[in-house]
Amino acid sequence: MRAEGNDMAESGRAVFSAADYYPAPSGRVITYAAGGRGRQIMAADVTALVAALTSPVDGVEYELFADFFLVYRNFLEARRLLELLEARFDWSLGEIGAGRAKARVVGEITLVRTFVLLRHWVINYFAQDFLPDVALRERFLAFVNGLGGAAGGTRPKIVANIVVSLKKTWAYTVRLIWDDLDLEREFELRSADAWLQFQIPDVTQLKTEAGLQRDSRLSFYARQSSTNPSFRNESVLSLYRPKDNFQLPVRNNDYNIKQGTRIKKRTASMFLYPQDSLNAPSGNQKPQCSLEPPFPAHSHVRKISHISKVTNVSNVIKEVAYPTSPAVESFFPPTPSKKLEFTVNSTYVPPAAAECSREPSAQKKPRSPNGYRAVTGLLSKWRMNHLSRHKACDRTSTVEPAMDNLIKYVFSISSLESPKGDIQEEREISPSKFDILSARTIEEVEHLITVENEVLQKVTAHEGKVPITSSSAREARFPPLLNEAPLLDQAPLGNGQEYSVIDNLNLYRTVSTIATSVIKLTRTASQRQTKVTLPPPPPLRQRPTSLSAFRGSSSRMLLSDSLRRDGYQNSKASLHLRPLASADENAEGSSVQASNPPQVIFHTHALIKTPTDKVFDAKAVEDTSPKTSLVSTQVTDARPPSYESTITYDSDLQDITMRDYNTSNQTENHNDGTLDTNQPILNRKTNHSNLREFLFEASTSGSPAAHTTQEPTDESTGRLGACPTVMRSISEPIPTVMRSNNGDTHTKAKPEFNIQSHDDTFSRKPMRPSLLSPPINIRGSFDTLHRKNVPAPISVPPNPVTKNASVSPASGRISIIKKSGNRTSPTTRSPLLDTTSAFMEKTDSFAKQEASLNALENDLQAILITTGRRSSTFSKSGTDSTIATNVLLESIQTSPQKNTHLMTNISEDDSASNTDTKPMEFSSVGIESSASNSSSFADALCEPANRSSPSHNPYSGQCTTIEDRYRRSRFASQPDSLLGYINENGNKYIFSPGETAEDASPKKDMETLKTKFMTTKEPPVCPSGNDADLALIISKLKETNPSAERIETENPNDDANNLTPPATSSSNNENSSDPVAVALMKLEGTFAKPAKEDNTASKLNSPRSSVLAKEVEKLDFQKWRFPSSKTMNKRQSMFIERRRTMTDIFSSATEDTSSEEQSPKLSDREIRELLETYKLQDPRLNIKNVEHHVPFILMYDSCSIAKQMTLIEREVMNEIDWKDLLDLNMKKSLPRVTSWLQLLLHNEELSGIDLAIARFNLTVDWIISELVMTTDIKLRRNAIQRLIHVAEHCRMYQNYNTVMEIVLALNSVVVQKFTSSWRLIEPADMLTWEHLKSIPSLDRNYHNVRNLLNSIDPIKGCIPFLVVYLSDLALNSEKRDWIVPNEIVNYNKFQTNVQIVKNFIQRVQWARFYDIRADEDLLSKCVYISALSHEEIGYLTSF
């Protein structure tokens, strides 16, 4: 290899010594432009280009270097460039070694400039050129390694320094690209001589200790440099001076008029709609029809030209939240002079709906067949489509939160309440209007769900059982707790940089997982059709499975008791929608309560098992056991439930409402609901109604449970009276638990249960809500207050989110503290209880181990309490959003999972005198949230002795009845809370003492803890034996939390020397905080890392180490779901992840183990094939129903719309990569789509430019469609004026891309023919429109737009008009690459492209200065837009 290099050096010396290249290239091989700033190369050969860049005569122009490495790939290969630079380097060494002084000076200057070129190339374009090309890396390393001998001997020292710097540059870049590759540290290179002699190996040549090839992982920097367009654009701009303001070329006033006309025509036909814009000549091409028209054909209708033949609907923002609703909630006045505003309730229903009787003959007919009942029909159809069931009456499936959010954010209904408005205009607007275009977007997603349900029905029908949706598919589609948190409960959104506009509801992932589920279910159905049904296994083998199903059904059954008063917190008019049996508008059984304000109710927590369901059925077990997993948590039943759980969206806190319905036929369906008295008795542990939370024990005749008065109980809940229609009457006495002086408990009143059957379920009084227990019942809970001797307790339902919470101690077991005193436990019978001796021995052994562990924990707890390390207070008035970590992790006593046992020692016999003075709200972790601010949080933990005594408990006796308990903890089971805790300020999160709920969020706490404990590469939560990670956690805690360090030092047993001091810079690295200085010192080899003392052993000997390890372990970080570290403040977006992983550099280039893609990867093509089967069939969304359409833009003010459109366009432009622009990587024709969802499915095949163009054209189509579908002249006038105002605000925000979208749409032939609406436009708005209309003029090749783009104020932000840049690049691309083929390069062409690209990416980067908050509701509507097809527009405009 070195011999080859010598040959190249000889040939290079001969070429660069020629007269045309020495000392600088002559005019015969290179041409410069006359005048201008700096040197502008017009044409040259490749050798002359290298000679000019390394010329020892001309001045250094760093911008010329940067431009060259951006464009050289268009006419020169990377390997050829490396050969030329090697030849120039060797030629310089030859000149230095010559005897002449002049030649030596020329050689030294040329050598330095050649080194600068090589270093610039390696550092800035390693990921672009060297990373994917192994041969190029090997060639470069062979060249650099061969310079070690040439630099020795009698050569000048400058040569040795350059060689060492070049090797350090390579090592520095390698350390940036790979995470675990540090050549300097690994090979101990500490001197210049060591660097000279060191032979740099390639990453593919490194071996492990076992002799295997090392598998190095690419760093985050490498992946971003390879796949993230925004990061790559920012890296390119960093190579230039920040003060540079790159300009677009502007034509002179005296340019050729004929040429300008030619450019005008050709530019318009490239990207925009020539036949739609009045600024361009219209064509007579007929639109192509690819779909069957959903409307009758009219041959006599006059044909006009309308939207372009290619609907390049935007591809860009594939993942922002669905449009919140296609309905209008408020009409803002179109102009300031119009003092008129209509307020619309999106959940309003005309009074006739409330009077709807259950009898079909008594129902009142609406005025229009497509009135509000069409709206309710759509909602009901979507709701029922979400449920996977066998019969229409079966409502046992759970509605996916993501799909409910989709409907919630998309659908809205217009209703007008105008006390001072134009009465005549109000009468002309129907109260049942909604945005049909937005509803179409929902319908497309619902189509996929329908297909999934149909396939699921086939699968389950073959099995002869109730359909159960695949839990894995559901979990993959809708992630658990953290990802399902309500959007309003997220951390407050900052500026747009902290908000992922492209990924709001993650619709791309939702659609992908639905399609994956459909394909998997289809394969399963085809496979099961050929299988022979096998007989069920023996009953003995089914017991574990049956037990699992029994437990699962019991835990979910308890959810049915989460009751609340039959009232509403919000008094505004709203629509109450019960799920109908079908999508039919006249379906029977739908009724609306007239006594209360109606509400829109989305059912997200339907019951799996009902209070009337029998828990155990041997035959059912035999039928289902072979198909049920041991850990199955989804057990469904075809019988209708007694209650429906609903969630309202009228308030920030969702209320769970439990209503009984459809019980008239329940008794005959459950005649076998009585208990079998021959079954063995199961003793229930005190305070635990969930079977998962207590141990199974054999019952003996002498046990206290044997003497308990037996009542009919429900096996799934432990509730008395397990008959199908048993309802607890509101008049029944409520048992009150009292404690006598001797410590025994008794009930004050014994409730009586009556079996009642009601035919009219809606005539009942609302049920008394049952007790709400804390969701985490570890080592006892507040249930001790009322579960002592209650013979018939109402079951205590767990919080629905408990399954996602961390509920076990670090040991993974659940223990229950037993209290002294005579008591009896409620009993229930278990059909599966094993009374054999072996089972009894195991039970006794487990009980002994449990007691031993409890004793150890009590001892450890006592030791920690006496240490005195409690200084922080638990104050609600704090300004921080979370409690300090040292309070959270002070001791095991303060752990969230250990605090539940604190309240078990509260006695029940104290006076309740202070009950009415200050109501107490029970925390799910046992923290007294009503304590005064002056009380210390540690004080609540340091007095266990006082708490055990009734006389010392100030809060005892406050909740002695079920009613009192419920009143003070009525929010404890809110489904959207993390652990069911709400303080006085409405803050429902545990560790957030802020004043409002907006400052508190579980994700905030998670991110705080993650930042403090999970910043290391290895998992921060370590097992007890991982001492190294423990030391890192302790060190990080002390660095981030000074108070924790102070606490540690207060312990007299700890050695102060064991604490790791913060890292300090050495004397020679005083400026190491400057990244530029650090980089230079690393390149020169003068940077030395401060020595770190190994204090691991001393730390591990500290008694605090094991305590902290257990505390951190109890937080169970490994089971919590965190977003990826690279998107700390952003939601995960599968759409963005797919776009970032489409280009594989090599096997490890795009691997990211932190990416949580729950479902198997399915190509967009396969998903599109499923969506192609969709055809619009719902008549309510047909264009024949346009009289009920109203644009959602009338719901918001123009400034808000302009802001959200600006955020969207910023994200769109960030997807355009500089190299795609230089190469003009774009499709000649884009797919014809009419909705954003359809574009989502073209993610893998569209470049950033294609996305931007498609988004642009879709927006134009959408604006035209909104105006075409608005039949009311005044509403259309208002919509046009609203769009004019939006465009004007966008112009002020320097968002010229949106300005052009609106202007082109309003100036289209289709919209301009609405002369009756244009006549009503206000004169001031017409003046604004005339000014806006002049901006996109094609005269002189967008002369007006170019002047605006060249005069932008960077601080205000900017969204450039993409079409201007694409037209310039397209015109410039028609020039020749070579003036003389393969000899003389037309370098001016490529340098012009660079100037255009730099101007574009610079203005896109200026968009970061926008300070705009994302409005989730409006943003969703603006992103997930839908447009009419060209045929539909032609049909509507033909009359």
Swiss-Prot record:
GO terms for biological process: asymmetric protein localization to new mitotic spindle pole body; cell division; positive regulation of exit from mitosis; Ras protein signal transduction; vesicle-mediated transport. Transmembrane segments: none annotated. It is found in: Cytoplasm; Bud. Disulfide bonds: none annotated. Residues 699-711, 822-832, 1054-1073 have a biased composition (Polar residues). The keyword Acyltransferase does not apply. Keywords: Cell cycle, Cell division, Cytoplasm, Guanine-nucleotide releasing factor, Mitosis. One of its GO terms (molecular function) is guanyl-nucleotide exchange factor activity. InterPro entries: Ras-like_GEF, Ras-like_Gua-exchang_fac_N, Ras_G-nucl-exch_fac_CS, Ras_GEF_dom_sf, RASGEF_cat_dom, RASGEF_cat_dom_sf. Residues 525-552, 699-721, 790-832, 1041-1073 are annotated as: Disordered. Residues 1197-1438 form the Ras-GEF domain. SUPFAM superfamilies: Ras GEF. Its main location: cytoplasm. Residues 37-167 form the N-terminal Ras-GEF domain. GO terms for cellular component: cellular bud; cytoplasm; plasma membrane. Signal peptide: none annotated. PROSITE patterns: RASGEF, RASGEF_CAT, RASGEF_NTER. Belongs to the LTE1 family. This is Guanine nucleotide exchange factor LTE1. It comes from Eremothecium gossypii (strain ATCC 10895 / CBS 109.51 / FGSC 9923 / NRRL Y-1056) (Yeast). The lineage of its organism: Eukaryota, Fungi, Dikarya, Ascomycota, Saccharomycotina.
